[in-house]
Regions:
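A detector of low-complexity, intrinsically disordered, Ser/Thr/Gly/Pro/Ala-rich segments
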Residues: 20-21, 209
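Bacterial N-terminal signal peptides that target proteins for export
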Residues: 1-11
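Sec/Tat signal peptide C-region and signal peptidase I cleavage site
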Residues: 23-27
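Bacterial N-terminal signal peptides
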Residues: 11-19
């Protein structure tokens, strides 16, 4: 009975993230991070070079702790400027791996950003970015529990598919404000991908991100930074992240986030009565020094999955490798 309940919970998990349907097996759509505001390259290629110094970001997320097969995600990125004295070109590389039940996904993207200077003080820039990469999808058929041993829709052995992708983004920033938009999975057809063994395992859809934030000085020691992210795939509920951070002496960041699905317009293919609740998060970031940051976040799930798991944990580290380039004129808070 215990094993039956465990597999039932895993089945609910897979359904909730669109991994399984009644006929084909589908891939998880876009990876979730609570600390995306500290690594904009994960959602927008135009972010490459924003901090100007060569910057490395590492993060790991363990989602829905307590559920067998729940998502485990790691990412590593590096970005910076070329030696062009006008600081017009930013380059970046990001690699991500994600495991969810029988599915494993790995991707690598090379990012290029062209940065237009908009004022004499060089505090305002408009950046256009593009990324080229590929994603390797793997599905382990041995991890499925079949009620009918002769079910031909269950994959046999390991199924895999390599898919190229293009991303595009635009990013505008000042010392006190930023806004960005990006589109990912631009090469997808929206159709199921068929492997050599005729198993349909992947159905990626295009996603659009809109992000923004402001820096509000409260006193000499405190600043408030509210941010948002809207994620749209034109199929499921529109996903909205609302965040607020209190900066203490520019060293400690204490924040909270609320993530939910919203209905901006009527989507005819959207399941009626779908639970759009997602999570609330507590976030702590500490700058050990101006070039080294460490962060932790905890997500409390507000959906029906809350009865089956103990939340999600995410840790991140970033550090800057400052070379001979002149120091950045204004701090990079985004």
């Amino acid at each position: 009975m215990k094993d039956l309940k465990r597999y039932h919970v895993l089945f609910v998990l897979l359904l909730s993230v669109n991994v399984l349907s009644t006929t084909p097996v589908k891939a998880q759509q876009t990876i979730q991070f609570s600390q995306y505001v500290f690594n904009g390259l994960a959602v927008n290629p135009a972010y490459a070079g924003y901090k100007e110094d060569l910057t490395v970001n590492l993060s790991f997320r363990s989602q829905w702790v307590g559920i067998d097969g729940a998502p485990r995600t790691g990412t590593a990125s590096i970005d910076g400027l070329t030696k062009n004295p006008d600081k017009k070109v930013g380059l970046g590389l990001i690699a991500t791996t994600d495991r969810l039940g029988p599915q494993n996904t790995s991707s690598v993207y090379a990012n290029y950003a062209y940065r237009l200077r908009l004022d004499a003080e060089d505090t305002k820039r408009l950046s256009f970015g593009i990324a080229f990469g590929a994603t390797q999808y793997n599905l382990d058929g041995s991890k499925f529990i079949a009620t009918d041993p002769g079910d031909g829709t269950i994959p046999v052995g390991n199924q895999s598919k390599l898919s190229p992708d293009v991303r595009f983004g635009i990013y505008y920033y000042t010392p006190k404000f930023y806004i960005g938009a990006s589109a990912v999975d631009l090469l997808t057809t929206g159709r199921d991908t068929v492997t050599s063994d005729s198993y349909r395992i992947i159905k990626q859809v295009r996603h659009i991100y809109l992000t923004g934030g402001v820096m509000i000085p409260l006193s000499e020691s405190f600043d408030l930074k509210p941010t948002f992210m809207i994620k749209e795939d034109f199929k499921g509920p529109t996903n909205v992240d609302l965040n607020a951070y209190l900066l203490i002496n520019k060293v400690v960041w204490v924040g909270a986030s609320y993530r939910t699905g919203v209905k901006f317009w009527d989507k005819t293919n959207l399941q009626r009565g779908l639970d759009q609740n997602d999570a609330i998060s507590g976030i702590l970031e500490v700058f050990i020094n101006p070039r080294f940051r460490i962060g932790y976040s905890y997500d409390y799930t507000t959906s029906k999955l809350s009865n089956y798991q103990q939340g999600s944990h995410e840790v991140s580290v970033s550090f800057s490798l400052q070379g001979k380039r002149e120091r950045v004129l204004s701090p990079r808070y985004f």
